[in-house]
Amino acid sequence: MKSSFARKISAGENELVPAVVSVGYLAKKPRRIESFFRSGGGTDRRLPWEQLFFEGRFGASLAEESAGEYAKSLEMVRLAPSASNRQPWRILKEGNRWHFYLQRTPGYRERRLVKLFTVADLQRIDMGIALSHFELMVRDLDLDGYWEVGEPDIEIPNEDTEYTISWVT
C-alpha cells in the first residue's frame, strides 16, 4: 500500500523514495511547528570541529588553521543536515588528500523505528549530503581538486568506520 506522499508524487508500484529534499527560502518568522521540529531534531546542535576532522591519523584533531583554504568547506560539512542529527562523517587530511569516512552509529540500523521506517541506508544518504556540501563550497571558492576512490593505508578506529572517497587537491 502506497503512502499519500507516494501517491502525490506519482511513485510507481516498484519505485522507492528513500529521501526528499526541500528547497526554498526560510520564512522571516518561522511557524511554531517549524520551531518545534528544529528544536526536537537537534538541528541547532552540531558536533564540534575536533570530533569530525583529523590530520594524519584518527584521534589527531585537525586544527582549523591547518585546513587552510578548505576550512570553510569543512565547516559546511559540519553544518550539513543528517538523519537523527548523527553527523556520521569523519574527514582525515593526509597531505594533499581529504579522506571521507562513514562513521556508522552502533546499533542505529537495529532500532525499531529506524527498521520500521527506513527503506534505504540513511547514513549513506547523509554522507552524500556531506560530500555535496563540501564540493559545492570548494567550487564556490574556486579551489582545484577532484574525487578519487582508493582506500588509503590508514588505521581506522573501529569496524564501524568505512572509507568512502577522497578529495585530491
Protein language model regions, located:
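Acidic, surface-exposed loops and disordered segments
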Residues: 1-169
